[in-house]
């Protein structure tokens, strides 16, 4: 059994390296998230201010600091490059895969269910996609997973092991809070309390829970006090704007209907989505088992809680996917043992059919109305991805009992190659930092920088290691930070651009990166002087203006 587990772990580690780590440095940072998190964490490195997050030199209080610390650490260790920015997400996702493996082992002590749990979780589309994407959700998901794994260990241990597990609950809650806020406390409570009530062990929760609470507070308190001292308005803004208004406000950011997460849960577990009905059916039939009850509560209660919120983003459901992977693995392995292949066969055939039709559609469009313009490499990679996905899922459909795991190969191939297989039209408009790199030598000598797009501005700031980009007729999420008196003059309105440009050029060379897609953006682009050196890529333009004659 030990040899089997070692082989399983070796396979998972190989998949982690090939699918999660290797692709990290081969495509530009996606806007708006990746460039934002890269720049904020880089600014921590250069400013030495590890307490209060700043975005392009402006106060940015949408999240606490700990998530930025890990991204900054990645850049400190691996360099201020694409790999360094993304490594925190990849490691957090990889460690969550390990947690799925460990929790399945603790619950069932079955190597096949352990391996299936980790493999399913690692190949879920949402999980694998976020592993190569620099944001805070993989980190927050990891700390939530640690919290609930430690809770399960705590309620199934005695003596010092139980105390250590409760202490780990507190540590993980504390770091989770410093990563993304109060949700790190809410999710464990809404899962643990009903579970202990159902198991008639509420007294145990009341006895040991305060230990976890005290440790969580002890972990958070130094930073919480430090940021209050440095930025007295932080907690008001973070609590009311980022939590209360987003949860219940009529004008909540990213507002979506209550049912938003239902179809999204199906999409999140692709390429295993057709196993979902059988998984939920079996879990409901076995809901009286403590292990299944715990996993069901972990899956459903956060989903219900998040559905009540007015503001919703797809990645918010990431903490629900580890229990889903375990429930699905339990169903899958038991069906394999009984020789039941219907659900697996249907899953493989459905996935292969959809992707094959996508491949046919791509070839047809390429012949009739090309998606790829003189991009043989990108087109070849797209065909490889679609063909590989089709083949991997067709194997499951044809031989479901022996090739049940092959959809994971298709998922990992997709995640590894898709960013490089996209058309230039998408890449050029959504990843501006390679465009900046190609003209970095000219931009580096500029004394003033300007942009009308926050994503492009943050890419420029990160690549040039300069947060002082002036914001031309755009502020968006930086509106709060721009309201402080010590940063006045960072925004440039349309009616003031001539005066700003004249003053800036009197001091030295001026570098500008502009987006010219909407009518308003085109108007902003037209308002700039015509005597600059201009470079265009997609709907982005870089302009370099020489210093004006004195």
Swiss-Prot record:
<keyword id="KW-0448">Lipopolysaccharide biosynthesis</keyword>
<dbReference type="GO" id="GO:0009103">
    <property type="term" value="P:lipopolysaccharide biosynthetic process"/>
</dbReference>
<dbReference type="InterPro" id="IPR050297">
    <property type="entry name" value="LipidA_mod_glycosyltrf_83"/>
</dbReference>
<feature type="transmembrane region" description="Helical">
    <location>
        <begin position="291"/>
        <end position="311"/>
    </location>
</feature>
<dbReference type="Pfam" id="PF02366">
    <property type="entry name" value="PMT"/>
</dbReference>
<dbReference type="InterPro" id="IPR003342">
    <property type="entry name" value="Glyco_trans_39/83"/>
</dbReference>
<feature type="transmembrane region" description="Helical">
    <location>
        <begin position="313"/>
        <end position="333"/>
    </location>
</feature>
<feature type="transmembrane region" description="Helical">
    <location>
        <begin position="11"/>
        <end position="31"/>
    </location>
</feature>
<feature type="transmembrane region" description="Helical">
    <location>
        <begin position="208"/>
        <end position="228"/>
    </location>
</feature>
<feature type="transmembrane region" description="Helical">
    <location>
        <begin position="171"/>
        <end position="191"/>
    </location>
</feature>
<keyword id="KW-1133">Transmembrane helix</keyword>
<feature type="transmembrane region" description="Helical">
    <location>
        <begin position="378"/>
        <end position="398"/>
    </location>
</feature>
<keyword id="KW-0443">Lipid metabolism</keyword>
<comment type="similarity">
    <text>Belongs to the glycosyltransferase 83 family.</text>
</comment>
<keyword id="KW-0997">Cell inner membrane</keyword>
<keyword id="KW-0812">Transmembrane</keyword>
<keyword id="KW-0441">Lipid A biosynthesis</keyword>
<dbReference type="GO" id="GO:0009245">
    <property type="term" value="P:lipid A biosynthetic process"/>
</dbReference>
<protein>
    <recommendedName>
        <fullName>Undecaprenyl phosphate-alpha-4-amino-4-deoxy-L-arabinose arabinosyl transferase</fullName>
        <ecNumber>2.4.2.43</ecNumber>
    </recommendedName>
</protein>
<comment type="pathway">
    <text>Lipopolysaccharide metabolism; 4-amino-4-deoxy-beta-L-arabinose-lipid A biosynthesis.</text>
</comment>
<comment type="function">
    <text>Catalyzes the transfer of the L-Ara4N moiety of the glycolipid undecaprenyl phosphate-alpha-L-Ara4N to lipid A. The modified arabinose is attached to lipid A and is required for resistance to polymyxin and cationic antimicrobial peptides.</text>
</comment>
<feature type="transmembrane region" description="Helical">
    <location>
        <begin position="348"/>
        <end position="368"/>
    </location>
</feature>
<keyword id="KW-0444">Lipid biosynthesis</keyword>
<feature type="transmembrane region" description="Helical">
    <location>
        <begin position="87"/>
        <end position="107"/>
    </location>
</feature>
<keyword id="KW-1003">Cell membrane</keyword>
<keyword id="KW-0808">Transferase</keyword>
<dbReference type="GO" id="GO:0000030">
    <property type="term" value="F:mannosyltransferase activity"/>
</dbReference>
<keyword id="KW-0328">Glycosyltransferase</keyword>
<dbReference type="GO" id="GO:0005886">
    <property type="term" value="C:plasma membrane"/>
</dbReference>
<dbReference type="GO" id="GO:0010041">
    <property type="term" value="P:response to iron(III) ion"/>
</dbReference>
<keyword id="KW-0472">Membrane</keyword>
<dbReference type="InterPro" id="IPR022839">
    <property type="entry name" value="ArnT_tfrase"/>
</dbReference>
<dbReference type="GO" id="GO:0103015">
    <property type="term" value="F:4-amino-4-deoxy-L-arabinose transferase activity"/>
</dbReference>
<feature type="transmembrane region" description="Helical">
    <location>
        <begin position="115"/>
        <end position="135"/>
    </location>
</feature>
<dbReference type="GO" id="GO:0006493">
    <property type="term" value="P:protein O-linked glycosylation"/>
</dbReference>
<feature type="transmembrane region" description="Helical">
    <location>
        <begin position="403"/>
        <end position="423"/>
    </location>
</feature>
<feature type="transmembrane region" description="Helical">
    <location>
        <begin position="258"/>
        <end position="278"/>
    </location>
</feature>
């Amino acid at each position: 059994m030990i040899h089997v587990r070692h082989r399983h772990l070796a396979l998972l580690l190989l998949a982690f390296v090939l699918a999660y780590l290797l692709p990290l440095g081969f495509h530009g940072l996606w806007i708006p998230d990746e460039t934002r998190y890269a720049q904020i964490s880089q600014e921590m490195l250069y400013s030495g201010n590890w307490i209060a997050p700043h975005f392009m030199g402006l106060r940015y209080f949408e999240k606490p600091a700990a998530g930025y610390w890990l991204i900054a650490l990645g850049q400190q260790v691996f360099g201020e490059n694409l790999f360094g920015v993304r490594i925190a997400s990849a490691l957090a996702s990889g460690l969550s895969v390990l947690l799925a493996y460990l929790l399945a082992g603790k619950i069932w002590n079955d190597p096949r269910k352990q391996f299936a749990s980790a493999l399913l979780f690692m190949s879920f589309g949402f999980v694998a996609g976020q592993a190569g994407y620099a944001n805070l959700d993989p980190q927050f998901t990891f700390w939530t997973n640690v919290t609930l794994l430690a809770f399960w260990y705590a309620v199934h241990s005695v003596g010092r092991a139980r105390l250590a597990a409760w202490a780990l609950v507190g540590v993980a809650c504390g770091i989770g809070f410093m990563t993304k806020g109060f949700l790190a406390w809410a999710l464990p409570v809404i899962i643990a309390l009903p579970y202990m009530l159902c198991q008639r062990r509420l007294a145990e929760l009341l006895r040991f829970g305060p230990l976890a609470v005290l440790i969580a507070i002890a972990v958070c308190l130094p930073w919480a006090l430090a940021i209050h001292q440095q930025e007295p308005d932080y907690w008001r803004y973070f609590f009311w704007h980022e939590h209360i208004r987003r949860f219940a406000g009529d004008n909540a950011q990213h507002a979506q209907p209550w049912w938003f997460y239902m179809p999204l849960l199906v999409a999140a577990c692709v390429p295993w989505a057709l196993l979902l009905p059988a998984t939920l059916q079996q879990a409901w039939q076995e809901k009286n088992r403590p292990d299944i009850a715990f996993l069901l509560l972990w899956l459903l209660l956060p989903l219900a809680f998040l559905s009540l919120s007015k503001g919703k983003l797809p990645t918010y459901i990431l903490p629900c996917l580890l229990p889903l992977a375990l429930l699905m693995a339990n169903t899958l392995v038991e069906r394999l043992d009984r020789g039941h292949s219907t659900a697996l066969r249907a899953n493989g055939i459905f996935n292969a059919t959809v992707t094959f039709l996508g491949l046919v559609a791509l070839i047809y469009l390429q012949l009739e109305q090309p998606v790829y313009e003189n991009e043989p490499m990108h087109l070849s990679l797209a065909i490889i991805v679609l063909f590989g996905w089709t083949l991997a899922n067709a194997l499951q459909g044809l031989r479901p009992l022996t090739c049940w795991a092959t959809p994971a190969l298709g998922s990992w191939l997709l995640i590894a190659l898709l960013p490089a297989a996209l058309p230039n039209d998408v890449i050029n408009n959504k990843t501006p930092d390679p465009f900046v790199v190609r003209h970095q030598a000219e931009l580096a000598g500029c004394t003033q920088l300007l942009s009308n797009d926050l994503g492009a501005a943050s890419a420029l700031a990160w690549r040039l290691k300069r947060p002082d980009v002036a914001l031309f007729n755009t502020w968006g999420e930086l509106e709060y930070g721009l309201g402080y008196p010590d940063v006045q003059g960072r925004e440039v309105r349309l009616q003031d651009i001539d005066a700003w440009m004249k003053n800036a050029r009197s001091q030295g060379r001026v570098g500008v990166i502009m987006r010219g897609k909407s009518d308003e953006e085109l108007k902003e682009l037209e308002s700039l002087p015509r005597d600059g050196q201009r470079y265009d890529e997609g709907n982005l333009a870089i302009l370099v203006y020489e210093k004006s004659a004195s």
